[in-house]
A protein has these predicted regions:
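Extended, low-complexity, charged intrinsically disordered regions
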Residues: 53, 88-90, 276-281
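Small-residue helix/turn framework positions
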Residues: 2-12, 21-50, 54, 59-81, ...
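Surface-exposed acidic, glycine/proline-enriched linker/cap segments
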Residues: 267-285, 430-442
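Intrinsic low-complexity, intrinsically disordered segments
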Residues: 255, 274-301, 305, 595-604
């Protein structure tokens, strides 16, 4: 059955009728209607209307003057008290109608509004041409709570499904955070609670029932200015187009605050590899990525995000049906440049990722300091990397990474590991001495550091690491396990510098010797281990041999010592003679050999000398 509606209507007016001139009027019209229904959102409505209505049917003109409408509606959760005023003129012949000085004001009571109530004010001048199917909304002004908007709109084909419109809007400065609080709208948690306190907007607009386009967009958000063009097509399944420019923004202020880390070294050391191997990250939003339909570019003058500062950023996106291309990407950061291409494929069960990125002349220390809070490596960095992987979550993608790359750093330092100091400590322990205390920073300075790498299933392998410094020459090879965040690396360190180099004074006696160093541990806690024992053993063996020969020389005499040295060291002449191809002897050679046969050999002389000792 249809819901029941009860209504009471009262009508009072002075009626004027001139049939000859076809003039009709309702003066001092008063209409009161009271309606009740449990089926209506507002169960009770009381409408009062006052107006003077004049109609000239000869000229087909109708005028409604002194229009005043009051509507009072009450419901279980809402109450509305609204007033409407204006002048209505209708030309029935041309089908052009207008409402001049339209004023709508409403007091709304709702538990979801600030203080349980708010006020809405609307003013405008309307012109409608039903023959042309056009509607002009001029001098539009809307005020709700602390939000004020002005504008102008021209709509075409208003009686068909091909509605189109254009115009402009201006939103005066307002405090979005306060407005949301007043309307009891919960905003996402942000690192800076002073954000969203200034918002201002102006734009040219156009569109249809299923589209909205902005041109000459100017949006102020706190200290940031966004300009350009933005469009949405198909509101049910939106497709976005844009060409935007943002002067500057500190995005970290709008992101959730960083969680405080509980410092528990034991738990950290145990959980870092294990948690990475277990892969506890949440699944990637593949369905959301598939729904992205966007094409455009965003240029940013200055950007701070995740602590990283960059300038002149270019982000270009082309995304549709699960294929997302971010190309080209570009930025200037830390005195260098970044260029890259990123491709995402979310059409399958796993997200496929492919990156091709390049860094040139970037100061690695300040970059890492801002990004992680720890500048593990400093210097001017150049790098290129091509990687691809797939998975349902970040950990799975790490475990599937494949590709290659190259890197180089100049005039920098490896921080958290002082190779020279590690060698000094090992040397002191093996010598039974205590290493001298030092105030040197825990870092290894270098003039250049370079290498290439390959990635296979998340394991990054490098075979040609080369580090050069005034004191050290380092070569290395090994693996970095990205999923487990652990290091397994072997380097060979050669002391080449003078006493003026980093720690050079106490290492001068190791100059020219190559020392193996094993580096293991986690990303947060790399542990170098110097195998100096084998090196010192080899060095000591050589020194003992040299001293023994010297003692023999002192006791046996220079002549015998020299002979013994020749025998211990080998006779190069005899070796050469053995390898020389024999030729027929001449008569002169035969005579010389006969004479030399009568002279004692070096071996005979050595034997005679040894006999004389005993």
């Amino acid at each position: 059955s249809k819901p029941e509606v009860k209504a009471h209507i009262e009508l009072e007016s002075k009626v004027i009728v001139d049939l000859e001139k076809q003039i009709y009027a309702l003066e001092s019209l008063k209409l009161n209607t009271v309606a009740n229904s449990s089926a209506m959102p507002l169960q009770q409505a009381n409408l009062d209307l006052q107006a003077d209505i004049h109609a000239n049917m000869a000229s087909e003109l109708v005028t409604i003057q002194n229009l005043a409408i009051n509507l009072q509606a009450t419901g279980s959760e809402q109450n509305i008290d609204a007033n409407i005023e204006g002048l209505i003129e209708a030309n029935l012949a041309s089908q052009q109608h207008s409402i001049t000085n339209l004023v709508i004001s409403a007091d709304i009571e709702d538990k979801n509004l600030p203080g349980g109530k708010s006020k809405l004010d609307v003013t405008s001048n309307l012109i409608a041409n039903l023959a042309d199917e056009t509607l002009q909304v001029n001098d539009l002004a809307i005020k709700f709570a602390d939000l004020t908007m002005n504008g102008r709109i021209l709509a075409e084909k208003i009686l068909s499904d091909d509605l189109a419109y254009n115009g402009n809007i201006q939103v005066k400065p307002f405090n979005l955070r306060k407005l949301a609080e007043d309307l009891k709208i919960e905003l996402p948690e942000m690192a800076d609670n002073s954000t969203l306190e200034l918002v201002q907007l102006s734009s040219e607009i156009s569109g249809s029932k299923q589209s909205l386009n902005t041109k000459d967009l100017q949006l102020t958000l706190d200290q940031s200015q966004l300009t350009g063009q933005f469009g949405i097509n198909n509101f049910e399944k939106p497709a976005y187009t844009f060409n935007l420019m943002l002067d500057q923004i500190d995005a970290d202020r709008y992101l959730p605050p960083a969680k405080e880390e509980v410092e528990d070294k034991t738990a950290k050391e145990v959980s870092t590899p294990a948690s990475s191997a277990a892969g506890g990250s949440s699944e990637l939003p593949l369905e959301t990525l598939r729904d992205i339909n966007a094409k455009g570019s965003l240029k940013i003058g200055k950007l701070k995000v995740s602590g990283i500062n960059s300038e002149n950023i270019v982000i270009t996106i082309d995304a549709k049906d699960g294929l997302i291309k971010l190309s080209p990407l570009a930025a200037e950061l830390y005195q260098g440049k970044y260029q890259g291409n990123v491709n995402l494929d979310a059409r399958g069960d796993n997200l496929k990722l492919a990156v091709d990125e390049n860094l040139q002349g970037v100061q690695a220390g300040p970059l890492l300091k801002d990004l992680t809070g720890n500048d593990r490596i400093a210097g001017t960095a150049n790098a290129n990397v091509k990687l691809n992987g797939s998975g349902k979550d970040i950990d799975a993608i790490k475990q599937s990474l494949n590709g290659n790359g190259a890197f180089s750093f100049t005039d920098g330092a490896l921080k958290g590991i002082n190779i020279a100091e590690a060698i000094r400590q090992a040397k002191a322990v093996l010598s039974g001495q205590k290493a001298a205390e030092t105030n040197e920073p825990v870092q290894t300075d270098f003039s250049s550091l370079k290498g290439t790498f390959t990635a296979n299933e998340g394991i990054v392998n490098n075979q040609d690491l080369e580090l050069m410094s005034p004191l050290l020459r380092v070569t290395g090879a090994g693996d970095i396990d990205l999923p487990r965040e652990v290091i397994d690396y072997a380097v060979r360190v050669s002391i080449v510098g003078s006493a003026e180099g980093q720690g050079g004074k106490t290492l001068e006696d190791l100059k020219g010797i190559t020392i193996p160093v094993k580096i293991t541990g986690s990303f947060d806690n790399p542990r170098p281990k110097v195998d100096l024992a084998s090196v010192l053993k080899e060095q000591a063996t050589g020194e003992i041999k040299a001293k023994a020969e010297e003692k023999l020389k002192e006791k046996l005499g220079d002549e015998l010592g020299g002979l013994l040295g020749k025998k211990l060291g080998g006779d190069s002449k005899s070796s050469t003679s053995d390898e020389t191809t024999e030729e027929p002897a001449t008569d002169e050679q035969t005579s010389d050999e006969a004479d030399s046969a009568d002279e004692p050999s070096e071996e005979d002389l050595l034997k005679e000398k040894l006999k004389s000792l005993f």
